[in-house]
Curated annotation (Swiss-Prot):
UniProt-reported outcome of changing C126S: Strong loss of catalytic activity
Low complexity compositional bias, start-end: 50-72
Designated gene of the protein: MARCHF8
Zinc fingers (RING-CH-type) by residue: 72-133
Protein's name in the database: E3 ubiquitin-protein ligase MARCHF8
């Protein structure tokens, strides 16, 4: 009876994932309604301007249909790479490995479920080993293993059979050893040990060895079952990768402190509708030598 050894608890249920997907869809619908209101306001404003009286030779404004909704809504959003939902206060996004782009963020609960199903502790893409912090639940909060009714019946029958078998083996060994001890006393009195004594001695040795092997195998199975129960009631928290967290801080710092002045005297970029060029400051200290 083979059973998986490593299992990790704190698994998010399908209801939690479906609720998170429902919240993300609700947010998308609200965002689309807001965009439609913005487009309608823009259309009414442009029609009022055209009715106010513009010369017929003037160029007509660009059609509103040319604007896409993706240009109004933000194109880059932090989403979970497993459930493709955004993070919130209840389930924030973490950066557990060196992956970048759309694979950079993941939910703690989604990652725990993936770790349990895949039985691995490293990223399948960048092969970075996750930084984990484990702790056991209090004993009063332990949960039963998720097993089918057939598996539970097999375990109960196995335990019952093992208890009966161990009792029979111990009783048989006790009887054989007692009889053997009596024959040894009789042999010491007569000075002769008959062949039944040696036969019983061999049977006792074989029974004792078989009982030890039986106990070892069954204890090993029960130890594995105990480890499985212990792992099921263990909570594992995956921490952020130190390198990615520092990188995120450095990437966000220039966005929070924009530089509006050209302090170093570098070239200033001018953009136009048709062309864009950069002009560099002239070097007034240079001298032209005619040969």
């Amino acid at each position: 009876m083979s059973m998986p050894l490593h299992q990790i608890s704190a698994i998010p249920s399908q209801d939690a994932i479906s609720a998170r997907v429902y919240r993300s869809k609700t947010k998308e619908k609200e965002r689309e309604e807001q965009n439609e209101k913005t487009l309608g306001h823009f259309m009414s404003h442009s029609s009022n301007i055209s009715k106010a009286g513009s010369p017929p030779s003037a160029s007509a404004p660009a059609p509103v249909s040319s604007f896409s909704r993706t240009s109004i809504t933000p194109s880059s959003q932090d989403i979970c790479r497993i459930c493709h939902c955004e993070g919130d206060d209840e389930s924030p996004l973490i950066t557990p490995c060196h992956c970048t782009g759309s694979l950079h963020f993941v939910h703690q609960a989604c990652l725990q479920q993936w770790i349990k199903s895949s039985d691995t502790r490293c990223c399948e893409l960048c092969k970075y080993e996750f930084i984990m912090e484990t702790k056991l639940k209090p004993l009063r909060k332990w949960e039963k293993l998720q097993m089918t009714s057939s598996e539970r019946r097999k375990i109960m029958c196995s335990v019952t059979f093992h208890v009966i078998a161990i009792t029979c083996v111990v009783w048989s060994l006790y009887v054989l050893i007692d009889r053997t001890a009596e024959e040894i006393k009789q042999g010491q009195a007569t000075g002769i040990l008959e062949w039944p004594f040696w036969t019983k001695l061999v049977v006792v040795a074989i029974g004792f060895t078989g009982g030890l092997l039986f106990m070892y195998v069954q204890c090993k199975v029960y130890v594995q079952l105990w480890k499985r129960l212990k792992a099921y009631n263990r909570v594992i928290y995956v921490q952020n990768c130190p390198e990615t967290s520092k990188k995120n801080i450095f990437e966000k710092s220039p966005l929070t402190e924009p530089n509006f002045e050209n302090k170093h005297g570098y070239g200033i970029c001018h953009s136009d509708t048709n062309s864009s060029c950069c002009t560099e400051p002239e070097d007034t200290g240079a001298e032209i030598i005619h040969v």
